[in-house]
Amino acid sequence: MAIVLGAKERKDKKHSTLRRIRSQGGIPAVLYGKKVDNKMISISAADLEKALREGGRHSLVTLKVDGEDYSVLLREVQRDPLRGELLHADFQAVDMSAEVDVDVEVRLVGEAPGVKDGGVLQQNLHELSIRVLPANIPPAIEVDISGLQVGDVITVGDVQTGGTFEINHEPSEVIATILPPQQEEEIHSGEQQEPGQPEAEEGRETTPEG
């Protein structure tokens, strides 16, 4: 999906200017890159939120700054910790012929037989760092779990890249596994305590009276 964002260059970073930008529905941002002069810009907060929803956090973006186009990656987003509103964004201009390192969502697909048998699906990695040409950045890396039985694991080495990217992880790193069903005694650990009997404090032994 092609993502296009419009932006305007701003000339200063005074607090009054930043407040005015935010009051008008925008956010301040910066554009930087090896072959690009650093620019202070402003963009529509609503447009960036839409781009994040539709394309994800690490998609390639065409950023139009006062009529000039840049191929960029969104490298950092700052939000208000209480309201969650966008506050600032950093865009990195990229060379379309040079590989970049990006983090991409891991999306588990399929239904694992082990889960149907009572096992518990545990996902250890929710993102993978990959090295890829900007035009080939996938929206997500799908990992098929439809063959997993209880006790089975899927590792980084099992991921099919199609030759379009390299994964910056050890092949032995676990992406997902099916844990055995919990036994009843594990769920209700320890015997039920008799009424009136005080609990033993952790790290101390209790001795019978008398």
Swiss-Prot record:
Coiled coil: none annotated. CDD domains: Ribosomal_L25_TL5_CTC. GO terms for molecular function: 5S rRNA binding; structural constituent of ribosome. Residues 201-210 have a biased composition (Basic and acidic residues). It holds the Pfam family Ribosomal_L25p. Part of the 50S ribosomal subunit; part of the 5S rRNA/L5/L18/L25 subcomplex. Contacts the 5S rRNA. Binds to the 5S rRNA independently of L5 and L18. HAMAP family: Ribosomal_bL25_CTC. This is Large ribosomal subunit protein bL25. It comes from Geobacillus thermodenitrificans (strain NG80-2). The lineage of its organism: Bacteria, Bacillati, Bacillota, Bacilli, Bacillales.
